[in-house]
């Protein structure tokens, strides 16, 4: 009987992600797409949007040398990490106009029309997803960065060329950078 329990426990543990980010635990995100220019690019936040490989976020941070965004999940909603009572909150516009646009609003601002706040999750592979789908990166954005989009069934979101699906790998932050990110 004990051997059966041991095998069950081992199988259960093997199915769990290695670095699972718990609710409200701060984390960073790295883009994964083998053989691509976006491979291992850190995710950034600036001008009310999300990017990969942006050289400067122009954010006000506790550690200004760290140019990566720090996030946390709470009940399916995704926030930019801050010690404010009203942190910046992400939204996704999957409408025909938004085509999967990911943005964020400052403080207590409402989401724009068609903006969805909930639907964020971390899957069993430790990938950040929206609506159960991986994210999309499109090249040639500001400062040579890649713009990040939710999968809304549009191959070229925002009419961008060269877009690629990415796995947005979650990495738990041991020393999270507290920032206030720029809005548009």
UniProtKB/Swiss-Prot annotation:
<dbReference type="GO" id="GO:0005576">
    <property type="term" value="C:extracellular region"/>
</dbReference>
<keyword id="KW-0325">Glycoprotein</keyword>
<feature type="signal peptide">
    <location>
        <begin position="1"/>
        <end position="21"/>
    </location>
</feature>
<comment type="similarity">
    <text>Belongs to the phiA family.</text>
</comment>
<comment type="function">
    <text>Cell wall protein involved in development of asexual structures such as phialide and conidium development, and thus required for spore formation. Plays a role as a general stress protectant produced by the fungus in competition with antagonistic bacteria.</text>
</comment>
<keyword id="KW-0134">Cell wall</keyword>
<feature type="glycosylation site" description="N-linked (GlcNAc...) asparagine">
    <location>
        <position position="58"/>
    </location>
</feature>
<dbReference type="GO" id="GO:0030435">
    <property type="term" value="P:sporulation resulting in formation of a cellular spore"/>
</dbReference>
<keyword id="KW-0964">Secreted</keyword>
<keyword id="KW-0732">Signal</keyword>
<protein>
    <recommendedName>
        <fullName>Cell wall protein phiA</fullName>
    </recommendedName>
</protein>
<keyword id="KW-0749">Sporulation</keyword>
């Amino acid at each position: 009987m004990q051997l059966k329990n041991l095998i069950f426990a081992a199988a259960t543990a093997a199915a769990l992600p290695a670095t699972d980010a718990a609710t409200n635990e701060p984390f960073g995100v790295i883009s994964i797409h083998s053989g691509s220019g976006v491979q291992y690019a850190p995710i950034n936040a600036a001008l009310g949007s999300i990017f990969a490989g942006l050289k400067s976020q122009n954010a006000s941070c506790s550690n200004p040398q760290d140019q990566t965004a720090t996030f946390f999940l709470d009940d399916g909603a995704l926030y930019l990490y801050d010690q404010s009572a009203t942190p910046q909150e992400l939204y996704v516009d999957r409408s025909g106009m938004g085509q999967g646009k990911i943005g964020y609003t400052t403080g207590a601002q409402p989401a724009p029309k068609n903006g969805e706040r909930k639907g964020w999750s971390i899957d069993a592979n430790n990938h950040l997803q929206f609506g159960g789908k991986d994210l999309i990166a499109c090249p040639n954005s500001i400062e040579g960065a890649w713009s990040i989009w939710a999968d809304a069934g549009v191959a070229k979101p925002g009419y961008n060329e060269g877009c690629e699906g990415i796995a947005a790998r979650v990495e738990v932050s041991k020393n999270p950078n507290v920032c206030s990110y720029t809005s548009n």
